[in-house]
């Protein structure tokens, strides 16, 4: 009977755990939808920015403009902005980011370049602090759905480091959101800005859908519609001054997009992890139920045998 009670208690505990994991899965799904809405909300600004850059590009050659954020210089120190998460229970999301970061640091060091880490997310901060890595700045406890203000804060500090020549190049390492079950860490260059990319805002947007009772993600290519400026358009300011003022906005927009995509990747990883945990809990409950029935059947059989043996003894 003690064995039966132990199995019953374990079944109860697993059922309670399954309720928690299922609730966490649904919460993560709701937050993925919010991340999707945020991405859609930033599209008009990104499109308009691309149009302005396109119009400026028709008035001057961006490759020939001498602006600090476009200036290439010999690379001695690279600032690597790494976007990870603050919490666990999201599968291999944080581990994959950390692994790719270590690989990128080795690649840069093998070419004789020094690396300064700018870390977003408590998991990355804790990992690299334990290993005495060269950390320039840390950012923890950001919003679960990143905001423009948070992106601007990070962007301003990266700009200051680049313009003061503390770093000669800035790279961004974040997790690109592919689907609910697939994501991959990618590295892209942030600073100096590439003039050839300023007037093209090609990217993708994602939508969380429900099909057949299951969550699924649909991605679609988005190409900003740009048009040539009217021939009689007059710039009240020097186009170079306008460009110089807009470049930080472009950088912050790139950062915000990356932070949003990384947040969606983390939430999708948490959804998948909690879904797997719920499935495993259901399977364990089924296995424990069989064990309970067998133990109960054995106990009943034993009692019958004892009754029969007692009757024969009389």
UniProtKB/Swiss-Prot annotation:
Q: What membrane topology does the annotation report for this chain?
A: Peripheral membrane protein
- Compartment annotation: Cellular thylakoid membrane
Ordered alphabetically, the record's keywords are: ATP synthesis, CF(1), Hydrogen ion transport, Ion transport, Membrane, Thylakoid, Transport
Q: Which Pfam families match?
A: ATP-synt
Q: State one molecular function term (GO).
A: proton-transporting ATP synthase activity, rotational mechanism
What function does the entry list?
Produces ATP from ADP in the presence of a proton gradient across the membrane. The gamma chain is believed to be important in regulating ATPase activity and the flow of protons through the CF(0) complex.
HAMAP family, A to Z: ATP_synth_gamma_bact
Looking up PANTHER family in the UniProt record yields: ATP SYNTHASE GAMMA CHAIN (PTHR11693), ATP SYNTHASE GAMMA CHAIN, CHLOROPLASTIC (PTHR11693:SF41)
**Name of this chain's protein:** ATP synthase gamma chain
Q: Which organism is it from?
A: Synechococcus sp. (strain JA-2-3B'a(2-13))
At the highest ranks, the source species' classification is:
Bacteria, Bacillati, Cyanobacteriota, Cyanophyceae, Synechococcales
